A protein has these predicted regions:
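Conserved donor-binding/catalytic core segment of Leloir-type glycosyltransferases
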Residues: 203-226, 232-243
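A charged, aromatic-enriched C-terminal amphipathic alpha-helix characteristic of glycosyltransferases
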Residues: 80, 332, 346-377
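Active-site donor-binding segments of glycosyltransferases and PAPS-dependent sulfotransferases
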Residues: 34-104
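Conserved acidic donor-binding segment of nucleotide-sugar-dependent glycosyltransferases
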Residues: 322-323, 327-334, 341-348
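Membrane-proximal helix-turn-helix segments that form the acceptor-binding/catalytic region
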Residues: 86, 137-171
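Short hydrophobic beta-strand element within catalytic cores of glycosyltransferases
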Residues: 307-311
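Acidic donor-binding loop of glycosyltransferase active sites
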Residues: 216, 281-293, 306
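Nucleotide-activated donor-binding/catalytic signature segment of Leloir-type glycosyltransferases, i.e.
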Residues: 252-270, 274
Length: 380
């Protein structure tokens, strides 16, 4: 019982999948820390791939019989799973959903409040990034088969996705960009709550100077829509060093693009946040060429006192302030990025000020604001 005799609402957490270390998983982790007694319901869970939830009560759906690598083509099975999940949730009062895809479709019982945290714009392979997905589904030699069936099914799947988006009581978006896209495609307004970032882990370098060999950096999964090819080509044309941290389906293609140039360095993986901070904090600038719903990596760079050169679209508009903690380039082209890098060279940034601009995205701030949203929604 809560103070005043009011019962403490029983909370359940629902998410699409827990199969890797990513932004959505960080959000789930933070929410569970806020509500430690809440069980987690998800369609797929890979304990071998992610150990954040070893001590949590995780309930997995029948979709888990499929390999996690097939996640992209499991939209229909996931939709079926989440459409019937309410049968297992009847004893809970508040359902908090962290949604990238279909989990927002979880039905609510009349006594329940549903708060859906949208980890990005409406399911992107149905809506805003449909053309990119059709062009390259990411299945190599099987792309033509996936492309054929996806084109065949996307119409009905969009209708289901729209219907699912009407079910939560409250929608919460991870950026102003995501909120605008939510209104555009789902015809629903969403409150904006920036996701938690480990800003305390990424700190200023102990020295004021950057590395003796100045370099730019980007940390990202190496997939086609991240447009890391633009960053590589811009640095090659500008004669600037670039360090790329990460791996992915495009890794080999990006290596071919870089050739034997000593300007480009690849680091497939850095497991330790402290090691990553040590590297990032020595960079001259962080290059962010993709259209992201939010973008955790640029915030981490800012927290380390490193200014960001970002495409003037997506979530970056919420936290990059021209001339204060970075600069923008207008078009997703090599030429536009090169021009921004030249402009960047003439700018002066103060590391303390750059770092301070990231502190508003702390985990503590996220939990405090989410608790307020939950209290507001459940008090009505």
């Amino acid at each position: 019982m809560a103070s005043g005799g009011r019962e403490v609402p029983r909370v359940a957490i629902v998410c699409d999948w827990l199969t890797t270390y990513g932004g959505a998983e960080k959000v789930v982790k933070s929410i569970h820390e806020l509500f430690p007694d809440a069980p987690i319901f998800t369609s797929q869970y890979s304990r071998k791939q992610i150990n954040w939830f070893d001590d949590c009560q995780v309930y997995v759906g029948w979709v888990n019989i499929f390999p996690a690598r097939l996640r992209k083509i499991l939209a229909v099975p996931r939709a079926l799973y989440f459409n019937h999940l309410h049968r297992k949730l009847r004893h809970y009062d508040t359902i908090i959903t962290v949604c990238t895809a279909e989990s927002k479709g979880t039905k609510l019982h009349p006594h329940q409040t549903g708060i859906c945290y949208l980890q990005g714009p409406p399911t992107q392979y149905f809506w805003g990034m449909y053309d990119d997905y059709v062009k390259n589904p990411g299945f190599g030699k099987l792309n033509f088969i996936v492309r054929f069936f996806f084109k065949l099914l996307v119409g009905p799947l969009r209708k289901i996705d729209w219907k699912f988006a009407q079910r939560p009581t409250v929608l919460v978006a991870n950026s102003s960009y995501s909120a605008a896209e939510t209104e555009k495609y789902y015809n629903r307004s969403a409150r904006v709550l920036f996701p938690p970032v480990e800003v305390d882990t990424f700190t200023l370098s102990s020295t004021d100077a950057v590395s003796e060999e100045e370099f730019f950096i980007t940390t990202s999964r190496q997939v086609n829509w991240k447009r890391l090819d633009i960053a590589i080509q811009a640095c090659l044309l500008s004669g600037k060093r670039l360090v790329l941290v990460g791996d992915g389906a495009e890794h080999g293609i990006l290596q071919q693009l870089a050739g034997d140039s000593p300007l480009i360095r690849f680091i497939p993986r850095i497991d330790s946040p402290e090691e990553l901070n040590a590297l990032v904090s020595q960079a001259k600038g962080f290059i962010f060429p993709s259209i992201e719903p939010f973008g955790i990596a640029p915030i981490e760079a800012l927290s380390a006192g490193v200014p960001v050169i970002a495409l003037k679209q997506g979530g970056a508009l919420d936290y990059i302030h021209e001339g204060k903690n970075g600069t923008f380039f207008d078009e997703q082209t090599v030429e536009s990025l090169v021009a921004a890098m030249r402009r960047f060279e003439s700018m002066t940034f103060h590391k303390q000020q750059v770092s301070a601009s990231a502190k508003v995205f702390s985990d503590a701030r996220f939990k405090q604001e989410l608790q307020r949203i939950v209290d507001d929604a459940t008090s009505k």
